[in-house]
């Protein structure tokens, strides 16, 4: 497993990380299979695990804590503070007081540490962000206090979908160590401004949603309708589903012999050296093995 580094993060992490959103609270989650998948990831060299308090109200953090206690390998831990108003994404008019007042930042850092059973997190992230808050000294002081007290090693921001520009001001403050952003074959906008700035500032890039919520993993068809309560029902509405399937069918025609669509999608993200790690969700052992194999296959041929 390749290890990549970013100056501000201060430690190497696996190029293939593990996104833990779908591990708690989903109706079709097999908890025993989840544990096996996590163990398989560690055995394969995955060292970076990204969770959040909002993933099952701390349950996903608990799963990560148990994983850490099962293994002697040094695993890099990342979690996220939920916005106080519990609104995703952060509305453009949202005030810092509504989302991340200082006492809320500390409270949920401590709650995450309790769920994990750890004295310190390698990386804590704001689960939503608006750059209107960038120069507000209240969150800056709160983060400095957490670092001073040894509760976190680094701080990051998780950017709203389709808004890779809505974090540039925060990065320019020099206080941000990592940025999490949607980046995949269909959404390459972070390449324009975000990635170059992160490289300049030494900020780690955590790429999420590499499979476009499943469409690039073969989970979408022209007639599939997701059940009520599944966010993909709204995301893949009739119009978006048709347009996405058109693009997928064009991609499939250009795939080299023997290469699957999910392999191409993951290798596309990993081929960009600006990306420090990519965090697909993996609830099954077969998914872990497939993604590890894609990582080990190396960068895509530039001709693609």
Task: Give residue ranges: language-model regions.
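Beta/alpha (TIM)-barrel catalytic core signal, keyed to glycine-rich beta->alpha loops juxtaposed to Asp/Glu
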Residues: 57, 128-304
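N-terminal binding-site loop/beta-alpha segment at the start of enzyme catalytic domains
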Residues: 1-76
């Amino acid at each position: 497993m390749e290890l990549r580094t970013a100056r501000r993060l201060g430690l190497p992490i696996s190029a293939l990380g593990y996104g833990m959103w779908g591990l708690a609270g989903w109706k079709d989650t097999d908890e025993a299979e989840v544990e096996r998948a996590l163990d398989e990831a560690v055995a394969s060299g995955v060292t970076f695990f990204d969770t959040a308090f909002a993933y099952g109200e701390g349950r996903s953090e608990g799963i990560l804590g148990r994983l850490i206690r099962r293994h002697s390998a040094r695993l890099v831990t990342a979690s996220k503070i939920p916005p106080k108003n519990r609104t995703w994404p952060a509305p453009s008019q949202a005030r810092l007081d509504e989302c991340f007042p200082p006492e809320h930042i500390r409270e949920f850092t401590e709650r995450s540490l309790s769920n994990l059973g750890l004295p310190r997190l390698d990386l804590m992230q704001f689960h939503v962000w608006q750059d209107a808050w960038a120069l507000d000294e209240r969150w800056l002081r709160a983060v400095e206090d957490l670092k001073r007290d040894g509760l976190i090693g680094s701080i990051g921001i998780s950017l709203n979908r389709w808004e890779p520009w809505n974090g540039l001001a925060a990065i320019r403050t020099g206080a941000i160590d990592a940025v999490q952003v949607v980046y995949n074959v269909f959404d390459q906008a972070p390449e324009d401004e975000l990635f170059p700035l992160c490289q300049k500032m030494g900020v780690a890039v955590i790429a999420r949603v590499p499979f476009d919520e499943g469409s690039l993993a073969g989970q979408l068809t022209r007639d599939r309708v997701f059940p009520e309560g599944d966010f993909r029902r709204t995301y893949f509405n009739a119009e978006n589903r048709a347009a996405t399937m058109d693009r997928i069918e064009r991609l499939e025609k250009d795939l080299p012999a023997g290469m699957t669509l999910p392999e191409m999608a993951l290798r596309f993200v990993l081929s960009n050296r600006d990306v420090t790690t990519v965090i697909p969700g993996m609830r099954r052992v077969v998914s872990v093995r497939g993604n590890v194999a894609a990582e080990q296959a190396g960068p895509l041929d530039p001709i693609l």
